[in-house]
Amino acid sequence: MPEPNLCRHCFSVLEEGETVCSACGQKPEAPNPDAALPLGTVLSGQYRVGMVLHHNDLLTTYLGWDTEKDRKVQVEEFFPGILKRAEDGRGIMLISAESKTLFRTMASDLHDRWKRLMEVNHKAMLKTLVLFSENDTLYRVTEYLRMEPLEEYLSRQKGEMSLTDARQLISPLISLLSQLHNMGLTHCGISPQNIYVDSRKRVILDGFALPELRTVGNGLHAELYAGYSAPEQYSKALWQGEWTDIYSLGAVLYRMLAGQAPVSAELRGERDDYLAPLGKLHPDLPEHVCEGIMKALSVDHKQRYRSMEAFSAALLEEAGANTAVFRPEAPPRPTEKPAAAG
């Protein structure tokens, strides 16, 4: 059976004579950005590169096509800001030779993190299909699911979400983060931009990176999320840990229930805090839910919950009930690590 005529950008089937893809709106001749791999590049002899989905100072993420299994995939390329594209359009070059050690260190840390993520089997995370090295850099291929960012999903809700719906969306994320934390891994990029929802309300957490990308002053242009990144992420002198993810998840819940994002952590202080209490914005919410979310959003990380299980128990427990909606058994915690340690 002949291969259908696919759009070079999004791999949707093009109808005969179609000059602009009806799915993504791109013309076949339109190229990828200069710093990205060219459209049609085949990696590992199997994965064809399509459009750029996201780019930051650490990774370039592409939509890909698995030529062996005829399916869409997601391809992440380690391409930090200290690199530029080689003349052949595929390889990489250091902008400055002085960055060689930094590149090697980040590559090693990223490879280790990706290998750890391969150990995770959870419905709220994209499954890693393969890791490989090519073009003098690293690649990770994951499954691809057609979903929309939570940010867009919430904008269509036209205001706050019900507590029942918020719990339905957040419970799988609490379960996933509990598993990651028990492995000694944190996300530190939780926001409505990195959470995805499908038509059946399945939720996925994506946007995994290195701590260097999630901390100001750590060698990369930090990719933080106003209102969702924790105060400690705005200084490399402060410690990050489970409590950082708890802050961000609390901020996501605040957005869901209040209908507005929390004020940025940069504008908050322990004395002068401009964050409106959730109970004042939504007085119909149960008091213990409001208190739980506001505790998670404490400026001082020592005042927050110290584990996802504790946050879950306080937040998801029905008033007067003896059991929580989600309360997994947790093994002993790994030793806390500073932000720069990964």
Where does each model-flagged region fall?
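Activation segment signature within eukaryotic-like protein kinase domains
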Residues: L169-I170
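Activation-segment/catalytic-loop signature of the eukaryotic protein kinase fold
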Residues: L131
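Conserved HRD-motif arginine in the catalytic loop of eukaryotic-like protein kinases
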Residues: R304
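AlphaC helix of the protein kinase catalytic domain
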Residues: L150-M161
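Protein kinase catalytic-loop region centered on the HRD/HxD motif
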Residues: L173-L185
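Conserved end of the kinase activation segment
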Residues: E232-E242
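Conserved short submotifs of the Hanks-type protein kinase catalytic core
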Residues: N135-P149
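AlphaC helix of the eukaryotic protein kinase fold
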Residues: E87-E119
